[in-house]
Amino acid sequence: MSRRQMSFPWTCIAAAAVVLAGCGGGGGGSASNPTSNGGNPPASNPPYELPDPASAPALKDSYGGYFRVGGAIEPSQLQVASDANLLTRHLSSLTAENAMKPQTIAPTDPSQSGYVFGPADELVAFARSHGMAVRGHTLLWHFGAPQWFFEGPKDSDPVGYRNLVRQRLEDYITDVVTHFKDDVYAWDVVNEVASDASGAIYRTDSPWYQAFSVGGGDGAEYIEIAFRAARAADPNALLFINEYNTELPAKRANLLAIVDDLISKGVPIDGVGHQLHVSLDVSTHAVSDALTAVEQRNLINHVTELDISIYLDPSTCAAVRASPPCIADYGTSPPASVLAAQALVYRALYNVFKDHDASVESVSTWGIHDAHTWLTSFQGRTNSPLLFDHQRLPKAAFWAIVDPAFAIKTST
C-alpha cells in the first residue's frame, strides 16, 4: 500500500460507459450525477432492490475452484463480531493491513529489545483457528522502516556502511520470516520497488535504494538480498514482488525488468502481486495483459489489494481535493448508478481472474467492507470501494461476482 494518487488508465470498460458519461481522469462526474451543486453531495437515486443478504453465498465457496479469496484487515477488527462473521463466512485467506509491516514489528529504537509481534500473532491465531491461510505483507518497502536501519558511517566508510545496512536487513527478514514459519504461506518480500517514470526502472527515492547506493554501490541490490534471506528462513513460503499500477504498460515494463533481472540471477522469486487499486475506468484488457506477462515468465499471479474507487474525476482530486471539477463527497449512500457501474467493473475483473485461473492463485481485497477503507482517509471523502457496504451488507458488486444471472441495473 502506498500514499499515492490513484491511477486512471486510458480506456474504459464498455459496460461501465453505459452509466458514466466520460471515462479517463479528465472531466469530472457522471452524466446522471453533475457536480455543479455548490459542493454538496449529489442527490442519491433510491437503490434498486438487492437479493436478501441472508441468501448470499460464501465468496470462498463461489471461487474455491479458482483461487483463494482474501482480505486485508487490522487485528482490532477481529473483536468486532460483524467483521469476524464476514471474515469467517466469506474468506479463505487473511492479510495484515499493517500488523506485519516493519513500522509495526521493528522497534523504533535499536536499543529496545524484541520485536512487536503481538498484533500479527493475533491475526495468525484467528486464521489458524478458522482454517484460513495468511499472506504476509510486507517485509520491506520504501515507507515506514525505522530510521536506525539506515544509520552508520556513510561518508567515512561507505563499504562498511553498506555491509552494516545489509546485515540489519538480513537479520530483520530472517527473524520475521522464521517467527511466522509454517503460518504464513506467502510473503510480499518487497513492496513498490519499481519506478513510476519511463526510462527509470527502480524507485530511487527508497531509503533502501539510497543506502545501498552509498559509495557507488548497487542501489537495487537490496531486492535480491531480501528474497534470498526470505527463502533461507522459510524454504516453503511463496515469495512475491508486490506492485501498484501493474495494469499501466510503462509501470509494468519497469516491474518486469526487475523481475527478469532477478530471474537471470537465480533469485528465488515465485510470483508477482498486483495491488489493483483501480477506478471505474480501469481497462480489463490491461489487467489481463499484466497477468499474461507474469504467466509468460512461469510465475504465479496474486491480486493483493483490490478495491475500486467510486470517484471518477481528475487524479489531483484524490491528492488535494483542490482541482475542479471534483466530485463531491457521496457519503455512505452513493448513487445507485455509481454502485451499478462499480458492479460492472467488479464482474468484468473477476471474469478476467477466472480466465487466468491457471496462474491466479489468490485474489484479496484491501479491506472487507466500506466502513473500513484506506481510501476514505487518503482521499478525504467517503469512499465505498469494496464488496460489502458500510453496514456490512453485500452490495451490487458482490452479487455481480457471485451470480452471473444477477442483472445490474444501470438506471432506476
Segments and roles (model prediction):
Residues R3, I13, A17-S55:
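Bacterial Sec-dependent N-terminal signal peptides
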Residues P42-S93, E97:
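Boundary/entry segment of secreted carbohydrate-active catalytic domains
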Residues A56, L91, A120-A127, L169-V177, ...:
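Generic structural signal for well-ordered alpha-helices
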Residues L59-Y66, E74-A84, T204-P325:
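Noncatalytic carbohydrate-binding groove/subsite architecture in carbohydrate-active enzymes
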Residues Y66-G70, S93-T95, A133-R135, V184-D188, ...:
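Structural preference for beta-strand elements that scaffold enzyme active sites
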Residues S76-D83, K101-A106, T373-W374:
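Short, solvent-exposed loop/turn elements at domain surfaces
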Residues R89-P110, G118-T246, I310-P314:
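Substrate-binding cleft and catalytic face of glycoside hydrolase catalytic domains
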Residues A106, H179, D188, E192-G216, ...:
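Aromatic-rich peripheral "rim/lid" segments of glycoside hydrolase catalytic domains that contact
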